Amino acid sequence: MRSNSYGRLAGKEEAEAIISLAQQFEKNLNGKSFLICFGTMTLRFLEVSFSAGNFSHLAGIDKHNCRIKPHEVYARAIAGNLKPQDLGYSIAPKFKMKTIAAKFLNEFGSTATHVSAVNKRRSKVNAEIWISGSKAGFAIGAIHIGSKRSGPVTFAPTSLQLLSDIELQEKSVGTVEPIAIILSRRNDEMSYSVIEFLNENLTEIHSSSLASILLSCGNEVALRNKYPELCDRLFDKDFESLYDISEYATEYAEECNRINARRAEIETSLSK
């Protein structure tokens, strides 16, 4: 198949792969945010928000050489009528590798395992989430939305790559921290009500901090209805308000409140 200096000419196989990935992305990730709480000694957290605007890059499509705009690629793909001629010479060199990783990405909520900072020399990437699938490990590079240091640690996924265990260690900066819990919500919802992943041991270790996060960012009624045993363990103390939580744990609650306050701004940034 012909190629130019930028990308390879798309064929039927590539178009069909993109259709399949887009339909899975629409079902599992588009319009969703995930709150990831992680850490061994100290619990930290970040939010990852997915939108249709992320799809083309994550799937290995060079938007500069595509014959239609990214939002048109996505719309036609989820409708099942994307054609090779729509894509032109937009198939990136690592397209096949990215499509393999993207299949695992669709199970993001239940397969993410670790979080780490990455080498600052890599353009604009300042966080990565390690994910273990049945056949591969990969990392999501993510841009921090907003420049204020005091703002919420919220990310938009920007890169996707398959990495060997050795490569993961080479690219990682500092400790790769295990994930304690992952919650999800639709972007039009204000609070988290679904638990996607749970590490029982870390949840027990960080119970006080986790309780403050869930009380601030979560829908307490919905969480209690869906996960009564877990919530009974976490909320067993008689908290009348967030002010009853220790000063240490309250820092996390305040950061969660900042996430809630800036959500509209964040989602506007993602839609551009």
Question: What do these predicted regions represent?
Answer:
Residues 1-126, 130, 180-272:
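An acidic, glycine-rich, mixed-charge low-complexity segment common to nucleic-acid enzymes
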Residues 135-200:
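Compact beta-sheet-dominated globular domain cores
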